[in-house]
């Protein structure tokens, strides 16, 4: 027996335990799944053996990890769009502290020194988010018009144009400001199209992992951006900021070159009638022959979905408000998840990191950034594993709970020990050390859960017909909150100091309850199956037990997953 055949046989008979967050999700598992689905959705324990013979659906078999090297490399190249965004984020945080940048784009004191006001700093840094929000909504439709690949190439070119304008800026801050907006337009398009393309070419059982690579690339870009700023800080001329910008230009060109080797989305190819190309794309992603019956079966499922959407006519913006197919409910969920990602307070930690680290003797803000960047980047590797091992819901719930605990400790120690009674003397080294530890704990929890998973959830939630529109709006909510937090944090934190942490603590508590009651589990499902799950109205806290229609046994009770008359506290902690 070959290694691959043995692997598939072991997978078919493997007993995977149900790792549940609460008794509700554990006990709601029922005898519903077939052997193949059981391996994919380990929240379910039993299955109907008699159903195996009647199930005619041909499914692409799961293969050893080595079989997915090609598709993984392709998805990493698409995810490199996250690196472009992260590079910009990591470098701009250092630019506003560099002497040449301040001299060129700041204002002059009476004594001849230069400074950047809070308003100008906030605008230069945060206007990028507004550009991203607009770009995501306007440019995301390029993926529907010309394909995901070509759409990505176009938005990267727009990003490059913005970089050129910034590099060419001499001493007019508004020229640099305009360049930031244009670069933001490009990154906004990247943030929608990159996760979208990855989700549509990935095999379903590693889709969450591969989409999470987008966030991994963001953290890598941020970290290397910090390192580059550290390397150029000793210069006294425009090398300080023009070299990092020039490297950003080079990274964008690298991505454009790499995109030529990436397969197009099979769902887009089916939509435009290129069936043979769609079969080759699916075959490449799953390491099988294009003539494999399972490939044709998947193409037929996509075709059926596309044909149903075509019968309904062209998708309009008004259609996203439809409640009949649960599109509006999905949009609200996607927008909330993206908004709550910002409201978890990660940017608050990066803003206060310099202050806290200074209190214990680390006075170099560039060194502080590198420390935080290392923790953020290294932790994301753990998140890539967790998203497929434990699922989307469970990771988000764990993340919200653990970050709440970290935020409570961080804010409380800051208020009562580091700056007692609002006195900013930073006299307690023990308090500072404690806050550093919990800053790192917080970043670990964020990077493994709430950093990557909102991108995963949004990339697989919406039907193909309105996917680009819904993802653009959801992502725009993220950018807008990013702008608001980035712009107003210096003013708010200056007024209430570490009490600001309690605001984010409240947002994290709300996030926990929101995820439990409104975010369904989609691990191990195809994109078409996710669509069916939503249309059937399955309750999110019962969704781990849901089984696709073509895999159900004779005793499957769909109604049981759509109704729950228990009080909310029993839904969360009680047994059925």
Curated annotation (Swiss-Prot):
GO biological process, one term: carbohydrate transport
Region Disordered, residue ranges: 1-56
Compositional bias per record (Polar residues), positions renumbered to this chain: 25-37
InterPro entries tied to this protein: MFS_dom, MFS_sugar_transport-like, MFS_Sugar_Transporters, MFS_trans_sf, Sugar/inositol_transpt, Sugar_transporter_CS
Record location of the Glycyl lysine isopeptide (Lys-Gly) (interchain with G-Cter in ubiquitin) cross-link: 45
Transmembrane segment boundaries: 67-87, 123-143, 150-170, 181-201, 208-228, 243-263, 347-363, 370-387, 395-415, 438-458, 476-496, 498-518
Glycosylation sites: 425
Topology within the bilayer: Multi-pass membrane protein
Topology Cytoplasmic: residue spans: 1-66, 144-149, 202-207, 264-346, 388-394, 459-475, 519-576
Extracellular membrane side: 88-122, 171-180, 229-242, 364-369, 416-437, 497
SUPFAM superfamilies with a match to the protein in the record: MFS general substrate transporter
MF-aspect GO terms: carbohydrate:proton symporter activity; D-glucose transmembrane transporter activity; fructose transmembrane transporter activity; mannose transmembrane transporter activity; pentose transmembrane transporter activity
Record comment: activity regulation: Xylose uptake is strongly inhibited by glucose.
Gene Ontology CC annotation, any one: cell periphery
Biased composition (Basic and acidic residues): 38-54
Pfam families: Sugar_tr (PF00083)
Protein keywords: Cell membrane, Glycoprotein, Isopeptide bond, Membrane, Repeat, Sugar transport, Transmembrane, Transmembrane helix, Transport, Ubl conjugation
Subcellular location: Cell membrane
Domain of life of the organism encoding this protein: Eukaryota
UniProt main location, coarse: membrane
Note: Glucose transport is thought to be mediated by two kinetically distinct systems, a glucose-repressible high-affinity system and a constitutive low-affinity system.
NCBIfam families hit by this protein: SP
Family according to the record: Belongs to the major facilitator superfamily. Sugar transporter (TC 2.A.1.1) family.
Role summary: Low-affinity glucose transporter. Can also transport xylose.
Protein name: Low-affinity glucose transporter HXT4
Species assigned in the record: Saccharomyces cerevisiae (strain ATCC 204508 / S288c)
Taxonomic placement: Eukaryota, Fungi, Dikarya, Ascomycota, Saccharomycotina
């Amino acid at each position: 027996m070959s290694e691959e055949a043995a692997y598939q046989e072991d997978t078919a008979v493997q007993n995977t335990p149900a790792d549940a967050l609460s008794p509700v999700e554990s006990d709601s598992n029922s005898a519903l799944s077939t052997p193949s689905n059981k391996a994919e959705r380990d929240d379910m324990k039993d299955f109907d053996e008699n159903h195996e013979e009647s199930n005619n659906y041909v499914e692409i078999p799961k293969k050893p990890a080595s079989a997915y090297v090609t598709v993984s490399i392709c998805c990493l190249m698409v995810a490199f769009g996250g690196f472009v965004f992260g590079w910009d984020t990591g470098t701009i945080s250092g630019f506003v502290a560099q002497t040449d940048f301040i001299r060129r784009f700041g204002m002059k004191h009476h004594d001849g020194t230069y400074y950047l006001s809070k308003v100008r700093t906030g605008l230069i840094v945060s206007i990028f988010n507004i550009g991203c929000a607009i770009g995501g909504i306007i440019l995301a439709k390029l993926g529907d018009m010309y394909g995901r690949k070509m759409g990505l190439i176009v938005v990267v070119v727009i990003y490059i144009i913005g970089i050129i304008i910034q590099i060419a800026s001499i001493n007019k801050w508004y020229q640099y400001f305009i360049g930031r907006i244009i670069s933001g337009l490009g990154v906004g398009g990247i943030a929608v199209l990159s996760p979208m393309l990855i989700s549509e070419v990935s095999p379903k059982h590693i889709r969450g992992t591969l989409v999470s690579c987008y966030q991994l690339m963001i953290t890598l870009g941020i970290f290397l951006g910090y390192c580059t700023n550290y390397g150029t800080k000793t210069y006294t001329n425009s090398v300080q900021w023009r070299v990092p910008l020039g490297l950003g230009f080079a990274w964008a060109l690298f991505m454009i070159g790499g995109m030529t080797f990436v397969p197009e989305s099979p769902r887009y190819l089916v939509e435009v009638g290129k069936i043979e190309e769609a079969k080759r794309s699916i075959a490449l992603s799953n390491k099988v022959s294009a003539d494999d019956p399972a490939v044709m079966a998947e193409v037929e499922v996509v075709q059926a979905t596309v044909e149903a959407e075509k019968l309904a006519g062209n998708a309009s913006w008004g259609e996203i408000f439809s409640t009949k197919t649960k599109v509006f409910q999905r949009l609200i969920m996607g927008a909330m998840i993206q908004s709550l990602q910002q409201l978890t307070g990660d940017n608050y930690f990066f803003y206060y990191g310099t202050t806290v680290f200074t209190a214990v003797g680390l006075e170099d803000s560039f060194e502080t950034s590198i420390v935080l960047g290392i923790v953020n980047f290294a932790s994301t590797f753990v998140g890539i594993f967790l998203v497929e091992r434990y699922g989307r819901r469970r990771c988000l719930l764990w993340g919200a709970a653990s970050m709440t605990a970290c935020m409570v400790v961080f804010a409380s120690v800051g208020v009562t020990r580091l700056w007692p009674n609002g006195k900013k003397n930073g006299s307690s080294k023990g308090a500072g050390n404690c806050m550093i530890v919990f800053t790192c704990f917080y970043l670990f929890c964020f990077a493994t859960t709430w950093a990557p998973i909102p991108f995963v959830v949004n990339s697989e939630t919406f039907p193909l017909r309105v996917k680009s529109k819904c993802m653009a709006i959801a992502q725009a909510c993220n950018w807008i909150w990013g702008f608001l937090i980035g712009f107003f944090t210096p003013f708010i934190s200056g007024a209430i100091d570490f009490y600001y942490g309690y605001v984010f603590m409240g947002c994290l508590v709300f996030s926990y309850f929101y995820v439990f009651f409104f975010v369904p589990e989609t691990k191990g499902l195809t994109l078409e199956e996710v669509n069916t799950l939503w249309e059937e109205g399955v309750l999110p806290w019962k969704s781990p037990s849901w089984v696709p229609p073509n895999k159900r046994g004779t005793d499957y009770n769909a109604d049981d997953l759509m109704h729950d008359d228990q009080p909310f506290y029993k839904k969360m902690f009680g047994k059925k």
